[in-house]
Amino acid sequence: MPVPVLVVGGGSVGLLTAALLTHHGVPAVLVERRSGPSVHPRATGIGPRTVEILRELGLETAVDALAVDLRGAAGKAVARTVVEMGAGDVVTVPMPAPSTDELDVTPFRLRGVCAQDRLDAVVAADLARRGADLRWSTRLVGLAQDADGVDVELEGPDGRYSLRCTRVVAADGTHSTARTALGVGTSGPGDLGKSMINILFRADLRPHLRGMSFATCTITTPEAPGLLATVDGETDWVFHVRCDVDGGERPEDFTHERCAAVVRLAVGDPDLDVEVRSVLSWRPRSAAAESFAVGRVFLVGDAAHTVSPLGAFGLNTGVADAHNLAWKLAAVHHGGAGAGLLDTYAHEREPVAAATLDQAMRRLADPQLHWGRGPEADAARAAAGVWAAPVVHLGQRYDSAAVVDPRPELPSTVDLVLDGSPGSRVPHAWIDGVSTLDLVASRWTLLAGVAGERWLTAAANVGLSAHRVAVPWLPDEGALLVRPDGIVAMRATASATDPARFLTEVLDQVLARPVPVANA
């Protein structure tokens, strides 16, 4: 029997794709060329939508336990060295606390930053507990698809072998083997700036910091300029430095010994005990695949789009890809939807990725637009076409056949507005102590207004979970039909003549039904 879904790549997005498929009851195989989850964090900013998705999987608490509490800390610091920072010679931008408005939008947040390796360890361990088929030290060699499935060639510890799959999700990174095999090109600015060296190291900086904490610190000493990022805020850190390729440097010149010396210069302590754990070379990049789906193969994460780092949009955009795709693959796999539903993945995610790439590039052009606070900064962002970060993370909308009467226009790029419009994430509200986000998680759900008894009866007749809610964004006799990914599929402002028939017709449209007998 073919494997229902093969996930290629075991980074954060690949692992969460496998986790979401497992959550929806779809058997999946994950292959990853490394011997296990990466120990080297490439990101630390887990956004609010990703936290909501982790909560849906039951992993929010475990990830939050590994996050570094930065409440009251500096979001960004600038100092010549760590020693001078601890002595008070530092410029800081405070870590913004969630406003009341933001908490009204999403009550679920991590206490601070959580390095990507910690996230990956939690997800991989959960998959292993669930008996998922995780094949480490295994790489994709090639693939070919036909009308009924995909044949992939893999290379693992025991050599090469073939695998027949119904569908493939490629989460294999910026230089995706799957994307190349499909012949899909990329567009966008491409490589940005200089090559970088990412040094993961362990050293106890607490005596030098003297109680100072931060998410990132720009180190300005001429001997070792770079960006120091918190992993645990005590002994684990990442330091980004430039590789002067124009001056003759090569990434392989950055041995562990040299990297330890660079860290000591940045800290300002020549006798610092440093353990270099890992060294990665990378280059900022901004590009998107020309298509996110080809036949039975779907691109997610960096395989679909590589986002420049300022804004912490890259990882979170990839997780949103996985969340959008997983329930659709599950619906088709279980026979509840036609294969046409899968076409809406690219239709929905490609515009979101394009907008996110644009927003990251605007921040890169003037980083102060990202870090600035207050009315003047808001005005500067508006003038530069820079959206507020919560709008990028939570406010973007879908326009596809999987949404009835979509409203893709953003009400505001300054304030996050979630009003129940079709194509937007369902608004959060507390209903008897339970968030609407929890009420709708992972399943089709009808939310009916306070006078929506006919909607509730109809929902029961067609097999939908349903709840009565008293909220300002839903008329008393109205209803919202919410998809398993928390997106509003339909909004009715009043009762229908035949609510059950109406709901059935909406579901038929969104799910590309009726499903042909031969559908797979």
Regions from the PLM with identified roles:
Residues 22-43:
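Glycine-rich FAD pyrophosphate-binding loop
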Residues 9-11, 33, 116:
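Glycine-rich Rossmann-fold phosphate-binding loop(s) that bind the pyrophosphate
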Residues 158-167:
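Core beta-strand elements of the Rossmann-like FAD/NAD(P) dinucleotide-binding domain
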